[in-house]
A protein has these predicted regions:
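Basic/polar N-terminal segments that are highly enriched at the extreme N-terminus
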Residues: 1-5, 111
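Short, well-ordered beta-strand segments in beta-rich or mixed alpha/beta enzyme
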Residues: 8-16, 44-75
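Short, surface-exposed ligand-recognition loops at beta-strand->loop->(often short) alpha-helix junctions
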Residues: 14-27
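Non-catalytic surface loops within mature trypsin-like serine protease
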Residues: 17-19, 65, 101-104
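Acidic/histidine-enriched, glycine/proline-rich intrinsically disordered or flexible terminal extensions
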Residues: 98-111
Length: 111
């Protein structure tokens, strides 16, 4: 990891799969996170499921900067959305989405 990077952009999404489409929803989310992790400019990407059984999913990705986030997001749309139709058809409702700027040292990402 470059020592020049001081602050990173963390994309945070909270969402749920549509009833009967949860398994496909999770596969699609995981494929997108795997794709992001392979791209230069993405430092980490993961998903987490709620522990209360409510079906909520936390999706987070860490990018070196806003330009990397934009480029990788556009690449995901071109590479995956065109093949599988995108996440909209498997979402239970609108996701809660936020982008946060965080000091890299606070994340303690592996080198």
């Amino acid at each position: 990891m470059s020592s020049e990077i001081k602050r990173v952009f963390v994309e945070t999404v909270v969402c749920a799969g549509a009833p009967g489409k949860e398994a496909r929803f999770m596969r699609m989310l995981e494929s997108r996170q795997t794709y992001k992790r392979r791209q230069d400019g993405c430092l980490a990407a993961w998903t987490g499921s709620s522990i209360d059984g409510a079906g909520m999913v936390l999706v987070q990705s860490v990018f070196v900067d806003n330009k990397a986030w934009k480029r990788i997001s556009d690449d995901v749309m071109k590479a995956l959305d065109t093949k599988d139709g995108g996440l909209e058809s498997v979402l239970a409702g609108p996701p809660l989405v936020g982008m946060f700027e965080i000091d890299l040292e606070k994340l303690r990402l592996p080198q």
